[in-house]
From Swiss-Prot:
CDD domains: deoxycytidylate_deaminase (cd01286). InterPro entries: APOBEC/CMP_deaminase_Zn-bd, CMP_dCMP_dom, Competence_ComEB, Cytidine_deaminase-like, dCMP_deaminase-rel, Deoxycytidylate_deaminase_dom. It is an enzyme of class 3 (hydrolase). Zn(2+) binds at residues 70, 98, 101. Its cofactor is Zn(2+). Disulfide bonds: none annotated. This is ComE operon protein 2. The active site is at 72 (proton donor). It comes from Bacillus subtilis (strain 168). One of its GO terms (cellular component) is cytoplasm. Residues 5-132 form the CMP/dCMP-type deaminase domain. Its EC number is 3.5.-.-. One of its GO terms (molecular function) is dCMP deaminase activity. GO terms for biological process: cytidine deamination.
Amino acid sequence: MERISWNQYFMAQSHLLALRSTCPRLSVGATIVRDKRMIAGGYNGSIAGGVHCADEGCLMIDDHCARTIHAEMNAILQCSKFGVPTDGAEIYVTHYPCIQCCKSIIQAGIKTVYYAEDYKTHPYAQELFEQAGVTVEQVELDEMIVDLKNREKLSFVAGLIGKLADAGLAEEELKKIHEQANTLFTSYV
């Protein structure tokens, strides 16, 4: 059985964390990792016990939601709160960090940033990471890896295609169905 890569594993964790987001504008998750071990996670949302944007709407000041703590900051603050060092760690984020999070990541001593999607990627954030010697790499999440029924679905579809072939479906039609299955099961077919 083929196992998923560490990058895919930790990026999937960040996407799961993003599901806890209370921001209706963008759901973001972040996972801090050291030595292939998760040391903290965060998602964008309000302060503990505070009003959530999902309930009351965003509190916009200077085109930013003042109510929301970004996922990266939440993860870094979890480490700070519980005395877990971040020096030399890696962070996996669903979206490219904003300038403020970029500065916090650098100050926390995090050495590598993995992100899945560009989102308002600012050239100054890129410049700061480069100046600080922080490695930045895009790791797009293969969504198939978080589908817990993927193998069963793949097996089922392969069985159906086999039955269609046995039933005498035209080769051209079988080819079309197989191509459609390939797009659904990109990583595994």
